[in-house]
Amino acid sequence: MKAQKTVAALSLLTFGLIAVACGDDDEAASTTAAAETTAAAETTAAAANVCPEKLTIQTDWFPELEHGGTYQLIGPNGTADKATVSYSGPVQSQYAVGGLKELTINTIKFDKANASVLLDGEADMAYITLGDVIKDSKAVPMVVIAKTLDKDPQMVMWDPTQHDIQKPEDILATGASVLHFPGTGYIDYMIGKGYMTADQSNPSYDGSDAKWVAEGGSFFQQGFATNEVYKYENDIAWKDGKPADVSFYTVADMGFDNYPAVITMMQDKATELDACLTLLVPKMQQAWVDFLNDPKPITDAMIKINETHDGFWALSEGLNEAGIALIEEKQMAGNSADGTYCSIDPERAATLYGQLKEIFDAQGVEITDDVTSVYTNKYCAGAPGR
């Protein structure tokens, strides 16, 4: 009996130890789970606040379809301000990440280059061509974080009844001036390629049609193929009291495959907002995809925004429809080489850099030795494609 009692006692003791051990395991598991839950919650909370509540994007012109993906972030129900010539509002919920709540979109500043706008801290991001980022790379430390359109709609147009142009070199033979904004890289390229002379360059363009109308389209003029072509052929009475056909070359047609209006930041600002950009850039690019899939709500809103701004710039449904059609026809809104609608193609950037370096060396303009230093594709990793 004693033997049996001893065994029973040992059994009870063993059971008690096992029970205690099991209790310790359960408590440890509970503690671990609680810690993991807390850590996850803290991580989520941190991710929810990695972005500023408000951001400002500086565009390179008045509201137009070529900016559609940026306006898509706010949607058609934002607020247009005539005094500041801006558009602002809450970021649509499907694009709001990292604690970002509001966005302001500023239009062109005629008295200030966008690189200076960034340098002076007047915007967080700005539209600047990749060529211009390269040109300013020694003077202003900027970095491109994403594209807008894939191909540049920038063009040079002319009256085909006054100038018989069969190839870009024919522009030079006419001796006619080329009206353009100052400081444009593609004009430097055209001069360097022998498509025009420096004497033909007239950098006094202000974006209006007044000079073209006054002189009956006797010269060459810059513009967007997705915009001005329609206006001069349908809206602007510039020849014999009515609109007339124009011909054009895009800068890509002439071999200058620039990236237009890339989303650019000061390098230190991008570093500061690194965690934010990891979340935000894919959403910004999703907004571009969404806009291109259904542009009308935004392009219709842009008509009204320009009316509120009450300047010389105006849009119409016909213009917007024609512009979107041309974007698709000329594949100006295609995916990047990696399948995203976001990244900069390294080979294309290197080719552009080579074209510009020769020009800038001749002009005495110092630029970076490494084109990859002016752009990053790191934030495009989670970006969608079309």
Name the predicted role of every residue range.
Residues 23-25:
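Bacterial signal peptide processing site
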Residues 131-132, 206-211, 215-310:
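Pocket-lining segment of extracytoplasmic ligand-binding domains
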Residues 1-9:
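Bacterial N-terminal signal peptides that target proteins for export
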Residues 272-362:
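Secondary-structure end/capping motifs
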Residues 47-205, 219-222:
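Short, glycine-/small- and polar/acidic-enriched structural segments
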Residues 17-21:
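C-terminal motif of bacterial Sec signal peptides marking the signal peptidase cleavage site
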